[in-house]
């Protein structure tokens, strides 16, 4: 029941009792009133409860099973079936290990950090992002090419944890159960198989620096970034339960694998050349730790990334599927934008195939699809908001290949077609 000051006829908040003169806003409900201060307090209580739930990380009793994780990945990532299974199992085991820590005398379970190998635009980053979104954990992306050993010009590896802290709004508990994706990890391989006597700022040195945070350490993280603010207080972050996913294209690794396979087949008198004529993507599926060692990684670094997932190159059919099938497919995003203007957007089958072929020609994989679409759609997206009579836009292969204008269906034409 609402409270009223009968002498002054002033309304009061049903929860704190303050009058309408004491608060900025008083909102009326069925026989009750609530002030802006009580609303803000309720929001703070709810936000704190949500924050506490997030800080606990994924509940093992509610943790999705590997099949459920893969089904979620299927909604956003086309193909790459084996890699999705590897990731689903690794992520499930990782968070199960966190929620059920080993007791004294128990078998200690190794951390399931993951190494993803695959060509540009095959879905490495998307897989990691989708996993983090499903599990509702903080997520950060780092570029290995920007990393150097401490004391050299470039980013310290601790900045990776700083990015994760920022994604967790500086909540250390949440950050300690987050996911980090390190891209271009192939770029920090040693340039030669034998150890160098000189300092390798971008190779073995970075591997050694990354090794500590990947395997698990208590890192001292400067909240404002390291070198420019030497006097600041440090945050202590335990990286033992952070899942690290490293990815790269690994150009040239197929040659290392091919050489190993070739040596095994030479003694059997087989047609070696024919056996070795395989696509790079197929060869990456056969990668072993020994191949990575020969490629330029130190044994300790390989040992901290026990789960290997190889992605295959995307063909034309897969790229067409990527354009249309995932929940957030590019064509669906554009159709939503046009729908906001009251216009239907349609892509012909020929247009979809043309976009896929152009991406293959550019050798950019799925990553290049957006750039191709944006180039084709720029002019029409510029014009449509100013044209009130357009009801449908049709994108054909000529729009993609020959830069022709899309077919526009106007209101009168649409009405005639219905009649």
Swiss-Prot record:
Query: To which species is this protein native?
Result: Trichlorobacter lovleyi (strain ATCC BAA-1151 / DSM 17278 / SZ) (Geobacter lovleyi)
Q: Which GO terms describe its biological process?
A: cell division; proteolysis involved in protein catabolic process
Q: One GO molecular-function annotation for this sequence?
A: unfolded protein binding
Q: For ATP, which residues are the binding ones?
A: 119-126
**What function does this protein fulfil?**
ATP-dependent specificity component of the Clp protease. It directs the protease to specific substrates. Can perform chaperone functions in the absence of ClpP.
**Name of the protein in question:** ATP-dependent Clp protease ATP-binding subunit ClpX
User: Keyword Nucleotide-binding, does the record have it?
Assistant: yes
Query: NCBIfam families from the entry?
Result: clpX, PRK05342.1
Q: What's the subunit arrangement here?
A: Component of the ClpX-ClpP complex. Forms a hexameric ring that, in the presence of ATP, binds to fourteen ClpP subunits assembled into a disk-like structure with a central cavity, resembling the structure of eukaryotic proteasomes.
Has UniProt tagged this entry with the keyword Chaperone?
Answer: yes
Which InterPro entries does the protein's record reference? AAA+_ATPase (IPR003593), ATP-dep_Clp_protease_ClpX (IPR050052), ATPase_AAA_core (IPR003959), Clp_ATPase_C (IPR019489), Clp_protease_ATP-bd_su_ClpX (IPR004487), ClpX_bact (IPR046425), P-loop_NTPase (IPR027417), Znf_CppX_C4 (IPR010603)
Q: Which Gene3D superfamilies match?
A: 1.10.8.60, ClpX chaperone, C4-type zinc finger domain (6.20.220.10), P-loop containing nucleotide triphosphate hydrolases (3.40.50.300)
- Where is Zn(2+) bound in this sequence? 13, 16, 35, 38
